[in-house]
Amino acid sequence: VEFKPKKNNENNILFDFQDVKNHPFGNNIKLFISSIDKYFKFLKNHDIHIKSQNNFPHSSGIASSASSMSCLSSCLVDIESLNTKSKEDSYYMKKKSFIARLGSGSASRSIQGPITLWGSSNSYLGSSDLYAINISDDVNKVFHDYQNSILIIDPGVKKISSSIGHKLMNENPFSNTRFDLARN
């Protein structure tokens, strides 16, 4: 992420993905940044150029948005911290996770780890719907070195976006029951 003082009053956000200038995913990034500018005073006075690389296929359903939103959120909070009075690391970790969640719920869990929990739970003191917390110390050590293997059969774009899927879930008459089950 590069940023420099604005030359005009326009909201200048450039996004390159895999060295492709103004990649279509840039529209999602611009909407995201517009939705979070109230949390970052410096965004109103700066132009931003984001150059992104990702080894996950875009919009395929395997967390490419989580990795991008967690990385972008971390960069923005790190930039903000350059010009703010020193705060504890836990403040910045919570803010990174909070901002990442606004871009992708899964992104909130990608900030710290290795094992995190996002969502308020009676089982974990300090858990929150607003940001993820590290629960690595509470999990059996056998899970501390687990790894995933992902076989990509079709790198194409999935038919239903996560945003549409989430909207369908929120409008589902069984959603409150599902959310309650997830919390307990």
Task: Give the location of each predicted region.
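ATP-binding N-lobe of GHMP and related small-molecule kinases
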Residues: 1-60, 74-90
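Generic secondary-structure signature for well-ordered alpha-helical cores
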Residues: 34, 38, 77, 81, ...
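Structured loops at beta-to-helix junctions and adjacent beta-edge loops in soluble globular domains
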Residues: 4-6, 121, 151-154
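Short acidic, glycine/serine/threonine-rich loops at helix termini
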Residues: 62-64, 112-113, 121-122, 161-165
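Alpha/beta catalytic cores of group-transfer enzymes, especially the acyltransferase/condensing modules
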Residues: 91-144
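C-terminal nucleotide
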Residues: 10, 137-184
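A short glycine/serine-rich beta->alpha loop
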Residues: 17-21, 54-63, 100, 104, ...
